[in-house]
Amino acid sequence: MRKIIVGSRRSKLALTQTNWFINELKAAGAPFEFEVKEIVTKGDQILDVQLSKVGGKGLFVKEIEQALYEKEIDFAVHSMKDMPAVLPEGLVIGCIPPREDARDAFISKGHVKFSELPAGAVVGTSSLRRSAQLLTVRPDLEIKWIRGNVDTRLAKLETEEYDAIILAAAGLKRLGWSEDVVTEFLSVEDCLPAVAQGSLGIECREDDTELLDELAKLTDQLTWQEAHAERAFLAAMDGGCQVPIAGYATSNGEEITLTGLVAAPDASVVYKETVVGSDAQKIGEELATILTKQGAFDLIQRVKAEQDAK
């Protein structure tokens, strides 16, 4: 029986997601043995700087992709929102299982709702996407960046000068946190999720047909369509961690509705549109074209240039 080496980051969430997917493969009868190899990524090592200041997408995947190239591992389970829109040559997404909750979770001291936070309240997030959208609704809030895994951030809420923090609902749910810890889930209308938020992407070598055949059995077609549309939009916009960019699609199997957002980091400018269609790639590109005509692409390039100059 072939032994499959699975690459994973060392965080509790990453290992939980990896082991969950391995168990799904076993339940589906995949004819493999499995071993997990833990890999430290650049994003795991840099904890004292905002991610937007140390590079774009890929901070949590490059070392893992290198291990795939060198055949140290056979596949990796990623939080898909961490994956660059364009994969390196020779690597593919072999499976996207059903999506978990794509929303953002708002967690505050004393369970004070977002709309009831006092002026000047401090909200912790490491995401430019979240901060820009929060400031659009509540420009009177103070955004303070926060890094670390889920447990670390929840601890910081209790011990440091934060009135609230924002986390991905999917991570909380996968780790088994009770919904009691969440003050409220932010609607996608108020806080559009990151591209592919809540989805897992299983990355492997494109020539590993034996493995790809088994991975394909666990793909959820609706989630695949949604992720494809969102990632096509991200790729066309040349977006990354340096710019607030969001994309969220829903598919009923025939029709895909895709909403995209690009904003200035200080929320002074926000571009947001929705398109509907049946072809995931086409509507992702169509949405990018619409926002580009409005000025979103120029904004992205300008913000990137400013970041690179610092």
UniProtKB/Swiss-Prot annotation:
The modification S-(dipyrrolylmethanemethyl)cysteine is found at residue 241. It comes from the Bacteria. Pfam families: Porphobil_deam, Porphobil_deamC. One of its GO terms (molecular function) is hydroxymethylbilane synthase activity. Keywords: Porphyrin biosynthesis, Transferase. InterPro entries: HemC (IPR000860), Porphobilin_deaminase_cofac_BS (IPR022419), Porphobilin_deaminase_N (IPR022417), Porphobilinogen_deaminase_C (IPR022418), Porphobilinogen_deaminase_C_sf (IPR036803). GO terms for biological process: protoporphyrinogen IX biosynthetic process. Belongs to the HMBS family. Monomer. NCBIfam families: hemC. HAMAP family: Porphobil_deam (MF_00260). This is Porphobilinogen deaminase. It comes from Lysinibacillus sphaericus (strain C3-41).
